[in-house]
């Protein structure tokens, strides 16, 4: 089996999409290929068919490889709960909560597990495309590294180093990274990639020659800056700004926002623009307000109260349409109870009182794939998604359920999810990915169109659009990189 590892000079240099592109290229060339990231830190996660939790970046990479996402592609997921603590997910299940130092001490324990996981991939695939995290030059973490050079050493993988020229300083970041690697690590780096380039590459070439003279490693290509409608799992998410879009969707960007990939399908609608708001001054008059998921719902509710957004949301709820997802659904209720102090020591807190319901946080996390249908709609109107939450919500007779769940992890079930007020303009659900399918997305957006005097439209199938975008990404990267050299590095062709 062949393997290649993509590492970067820093976070957000484009490692994830380079891995996705290589997965699609190798697949197009007839190889069975699998993505692998030993440890990911993200608040955007996904639930597999067997009810296990993994990072969203490896989900996109799995689709690029033509695979159903599985947790062996991302054995360890860290979900920050505060500046100093994270929830640790190992092989799709909650391992526990720990501080950075506690987790640093746990890494030795996980090395053997990661090695065994990778052995299974060697048996099943022609090529594994690995992804590092942050930078391999974090010299204070070197002795227990399990995600960059430490992981490359465990499986003896060659490395390509990616630098982001769009931020500036790409030559210094590449040369500086190489300077901080030890001799064994330097030998693993077989090439560099310049990512997110704008302009004429001829102007860049002299710098590439000088860089190669300094670090003695060839540049394998320059990838142009390209806007693609593919999800971004990084915290500083930026949605494509459209020159004009009649449907304005505002999203509350809370400090602990999670699973904002729920919004990706919405931004695929041509007449929809999405903007994040962090203050009441930015609120304005949106056509739809979305309150997304949160890794710390109580802290984010306190944030809404402190910054004045609570008042804006309540005023908007008189005539505007509001959708809350997971944590955003919980804050819409009358009360959140935390008897086991899962999130804070407060015990309980008053909600926004826009839905007559109460949420209680339990000890165990619910992670499940679900299929549902809108209440009072035809059975064909199916919504697919997944749940990731520790809260159980109970509502009064003043609110109605939004969905009926009929399938849970492949088993037939019959229970309700979500809630909608009597007026029908404030609603919430635990289902992540609720907009990915056509049914609910088209229904909501068409209601907004009609309200503004616009014609109804058919929504495109998000999965089809994603496939086209992945092919486009692969074409761009194939044209930009020396693929013959990359095949030579991994010992193929």
UniProtKB/Swiss-Prot annotation:
Signal peptide bounds: none
Keywords recorded for this protein, A-Z: Cobalamin biosynthesis, Glutamine amidotransferase
S-S bridge residues: none
Pathway: Cofactor biosynthesis; adenosylcobalamin biosynthesis
Domain GATase cobBQ-type: 246-440
Stated family: Belongs to the CobB/CobQ family. CobQ subfamily.
Name of the protein this chain belongs to: Cobyric acid synthase
GO MF: ABC-type vitamin B12 transporter activity; catalytic activity
Organism: Clostridium botulinum (strain 657 / Type Ba4)
Job of this protein: Catalyzes amidations at positions B, D, E, and G on adenosylcobyrinic A,C-diamide. NH(2) groups are provided by glutamine, and one molecule of ATP is hydrogenolyzed for each amidation.
UniProt cross-references to Pfam families, sorted A to Z: CbiA (PF01656), GATase_3 (PF07685)
């Amino acid at each position: 089996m062949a393997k290649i590892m993509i590492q970067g000079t820093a976070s957000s240099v484009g490692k994830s999409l380079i891995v996705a592109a290589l997965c699609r290229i190798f697949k197009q060339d007839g190889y069975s290929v699998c993505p692998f990231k030993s440890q990911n830190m993200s608040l955007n996660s996904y639930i597999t068919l067997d009810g296990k939790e993994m990072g969203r970046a490896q989900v996109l990479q799995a689709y690029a490889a033509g695979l159903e996402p599985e947790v062996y592609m991302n054995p360890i997921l860290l979900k920050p709960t505060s500046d100093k603590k994270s929830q640790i997910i190992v092989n799709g299940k909650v391992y526990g909560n720990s501080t950075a130092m506690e987790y640093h001490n746990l890494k030795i324990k996980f090395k053997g597990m990661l090695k065994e996981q990778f052995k299974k991939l060697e048996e099943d695939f022609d090529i594994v495309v690995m992804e590092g995290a942050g930078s391999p030059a974090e010299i204070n973490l070197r002795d227990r590294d399990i995600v960059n050079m430490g992981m490359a050493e465990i499986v003896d993988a060659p490395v390509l180093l990616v630098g982001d020229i769009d931020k500036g300083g790409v030559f210094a970041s590449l040369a500086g990274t190489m300077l901080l690697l030890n001799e064994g690590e330097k030998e693993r780096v077989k090439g560099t990639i310049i990512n997110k380039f704008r302009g004429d590459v001829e102007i860049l070439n002299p710098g590439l020659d000088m860089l190669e003279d300094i670090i003695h490693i060839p540049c394998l290509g320059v990838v142009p800056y390209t806007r693609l409608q593919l999800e971004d799992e990084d915290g500083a998410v930026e949605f494509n700004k459209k020159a004009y879009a009649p449907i304005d969707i505002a999203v509350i960007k809370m400090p602990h926002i999670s699973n904002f990939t729920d919004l990706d399908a919405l931004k695929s609608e041509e007449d929809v623009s999405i903007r994040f708001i962090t203050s009441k001054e930015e609120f304005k008059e949106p056509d739809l307000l979305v309150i997304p998921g949160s890794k710390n719902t109580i802290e984010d509710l306190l944030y809404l109260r402190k910054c004045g957004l609570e008042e804006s949301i309540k005023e908007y709820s008189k005539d505007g349409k509001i959708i809350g997802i997971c944590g955003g659904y919980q804050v819409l209720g009358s009360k959140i109870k935390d008897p086991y102090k899962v999130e804070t020591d407060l015990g309980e807190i008053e909600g926004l009182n826009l839905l007559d319901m109460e949420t209680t946080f339990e000890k165990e996390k619910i992670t499940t794939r679900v299929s549902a249908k809108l209440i009072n709609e035809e059975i064909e109107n199916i919504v697919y998604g997944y749940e990731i939450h520790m809260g159980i919500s109970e509502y009064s007779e003043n609110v109605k359920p939004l969905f009926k769940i009929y399938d849970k992890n492949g088993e037939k079930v019959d229970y309700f999810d979500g809630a909608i007020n009597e007026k029908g303009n404030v609603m919430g659900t635990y289902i992540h990915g609720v907009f990915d399918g056509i049914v609910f997305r088209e229904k909501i957006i068409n209601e907004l169109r009609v309200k503004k005097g616009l014609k109804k439209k058919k929504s495109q199938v998000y999965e089809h659009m994603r496939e086209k975008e992945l092919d486009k990404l692969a074409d761009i990267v194939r044209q930009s990189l020396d693929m013959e050299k990359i095949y030579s590095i991994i010992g193929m062709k």
